[in-house]
Amino acid sequence: MIEADRLIAATGPREREEIQDRAIRPVSLADYIGQPSVREQMELFIQAARGRNESLDHTLIFGPPGLGKTTLANIIAEEMGVSIKSTSGPVLERPGDLAALLTNLEPHDVLFIDEIHRLSPIVEEVLYPAMEDFQLDIMIGEGPAARSIKLDLPPFTLVGATTRAGMLTNPLRDRFGIVQRLEFYSTADLATIVSRSAGILGLPLDPEGAFEVARRARGTPRIANRLLRRVRDFAEVRAKGHITKPIADLALNLLDVDERGFDHQDRRLLLTMIEKFDGGPVGVDSLAAAISEERHTIEDVLEPYLIQQGYIMRTPRGRVVTRHAYLHFGLNIPSRMGDMPVVDEFLDAVDD
């Protein structure tokens, strides 16, 4: 399975969707909906940095895909009144790639590195003195004639984004003065986002229709906006373009997105655990083989939302479905589950 092929994928949009996404992205903290703690803190930090005429401290933003890490990075640059240069960890293959970006920054500019956990060790080593001392150490020549020279860099702000904060090395993580975690959005916040996007795109949308789209969007703005575009297609063809709750419900059912925001892949994972592994515990490798998926697809794509919603637990012995999964499919809850610990006790447990 390719994550980008899922309608409810939280990965980046396709090229055509990306153009529309840029039009509906907020460009200031005042327009930024949700994440109240992050918004309040960043407003404070930015105001303080501007008052001192300094660069904002290096900032790490982490959380599940589609929650607005790139959007927040662009807002930081906009609020600071500086330019932003964007790249990603896999693109920076050699130290020279990073050096070219750093030497072209203006004072107080923002350098945004997405997927920063995928930086190669050799590039990461070059980044340390740049972050700490605003200096670039580069090697000139080869062999015995090689020598190191230092280049002074203008003060800048590195904004790193990652979905896998645990994969960052300690030296890199410790160099970020500001660390922000983005959480899944509430349905109310997503409904506000959907209504705002519909207004920008000129779509007639009832509040109840916005809420219906929002509650199936898995707590993720990117998914909410993608579902809105598909519901718009349905409404334009079959409902004269007006999106109401019944129209949104019909459209999303047609698109195989159920009331919990699950699609076919989510339901297949849960049913496989119930029917083939008696609800678990089951190891992730066995589960991957059973549904013909890669291990990382289960860990990075399918599991996070199911765990966050309490449908799957990670235990030291493997994955286990909860009673919520049985209830979702209208199945009888096994009697043995009456003795199971409360779901919340396991939500943060990690297995192999």
Swiss-Prot record:
The keyword DNA-binding applies. It comes from the Bacteria. Its main location: cytoplasm. CDD domains: AAA. GO terms for biological process: DNA recombination; DNA repair. GO terms for cellular component: cytoplasm; Holliday junction resolvase complex. InterPro entries: AAA+_ATPase, AAA_lid_4, DNA_helicase_Holl-junc_RuvB, P-loop_NTPase, RuvB-like_N, RuvB_C, WH-like_DNA-bd_sf, WH_DNA-bd_sf. DNA binds at residues 295, 314, 319. SMART domains: AAA. GO terms for molecular function: ATP binding; ATP hydrolysis activity; four-way junction DNA binding; four-way junction helicase activity. ATP binds at residues 24-25, 66, 69-71, 132-134, 175, 185, 222. It catalyses: ATP + H2O = ADP + phosphate + H(+). Its EC number is 3.6.4.-. Keywords: ATP-binding, Cytoplasm, DNA damage, DNA recombination, DNA repair, DNA-binding, Hydrolase, Nucleotide-binding. SUPFAM superfamilies: P-loop containing nucleoside triphosphate hydrolases, Winged helix' DNA-binding domain. The keyword rRNA-binding does not apply. The RuvA-RuvB-RuvC complex processes Holliday junction (HJ) DNA during genetic recombination and DNA repair, while the RuvA-RuvB complex plays an important role in the rescue of blocked DNA replication forks via replication fork reversal (RFR). RuvA specifically binds to HJ cruciform DNA, conferring on it an open structure. The RuvB hexamer acts as an ATP-dependent pump, pulling dsDNA into and through the RuvAB complex. RuvB forms 2 homohexamers on either side of HJ DNA bound by 1 or 2 RuvA tetramers; 4 subunits per hexamer contact DNA at a time. Has 3 domains, the large (RuvB-L) and small ATPase (RuvB-S) domains and the C-terminal head (RuvB-H) domain. The head domain binds DNA, while the ATPase domains jointly bind ATP, ADP or are empty depending on the state of the subunit in the translocation cycle. During a single DNA translocation step the structure of each domain remains the same, but their relative positions change. This is Holliday junction branch migration complex subunit RuvB. It comes from Pseudomonas fluorescens (strain ATCC BAA-477 / NRRL B-23932 / Pf-5). The lineage of its organism: Bacteria, Pseudomonadati, Pseudomonadota, Gammaproteobacteria, Pseudomonadales.
